Amino acid sequence: VTVRATDDANNTSTADASHSTLGSSLQLRVKERVAPVLAIIYPTASALITNNKPSITWTVTDDDSGVNPSTIGVTIDSGSKITGDSISKTAISGGYKCTYTPGTALADGSHTIKVDASDYDGNAASQKSVTFKIDTVPPTLSVTSPADGFVTNQAACNVQGTTNDLTSSPVSVTVKLNNGNAEAATVASNGSWSKTITLVEGTNTITVVATDSAGKSTTVTRTVKLDTKAPVIKSVTLTPNPVDTEKTVVISVEVTD
């Protein structure tokens, strides 16, 4: 803005933004209408995470009037909006990178976070939100067959049981025999699973691992013995021999297996 003053004697004075004392008062700023831009970095939408105190991270930028840091906020689920010093703000080009870590652990299950901010001209950014899941509990796993310590003469062994995870299903199950490779079991929609393996002669160690979608796992082991060799009768002794009628006779048998 330029101001010109002229008196009756036709003397003229001019003042504009370059004036040494009045310059700042002659600067007219027009408010901008472009809102800040928000972007959530972590967690991502539909993420499945095992940390129940996740570091929620997002950015807010505004290249015009600038981001007003006092308006930066985050809301978790239906809780109150969190603002102020609870949110860490690191200056970046045109705005801030923000981080908030909950002081109280979030429960397992689904959560929604919402972030918002405004610029110095009062333009509010379009709120951004993401929904994610937290899973800190490994899946349940039971092996119903075979029992630990089971002895059999059949090489084919059907390993079976049940598994479940309320937060991050489906659950995958693998079965490993001794030092062999872990092989996938068939898991039904109700959580029951089974896998047929071939035992080797002697003591076998069966390792079953259930892993949920969050990568948490539960392990159960069973020891099973395969014995296909019949016992050997090495000797039989009858004492006394011969024996009188209606008398007691002792039969001694030596057997190895």
Where do the model's predicted regions map?
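Flexible, low-complexity linkers/stalks enriched in Thr/Pro that connect modular domains
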Residues: 7, 18-39, 128-139, 222-231
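Short, solvent-exposed loop/linker segments at the N-terminal edge
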Residues: 46-52, 148-155, 241-247
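Aromatic/hydrophobic beta-strand junction motif of beta-rich domains
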Residues: 56-62, 159-163, 251-257
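Solvent-exposed loop/turn segments flanking beta-strands in beta-repeat/beta-sandwich domains
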Residues: 62-76, 164-177, 257
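Short strand-edge motifs at loop-to-beta-strand transitions and within beta-strands
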Residues: 96-100, 191-195
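Surface-exposed, short loops/turns at beta-strand junctions within beta-sandwich domains
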Residues: 103-110, 196-203
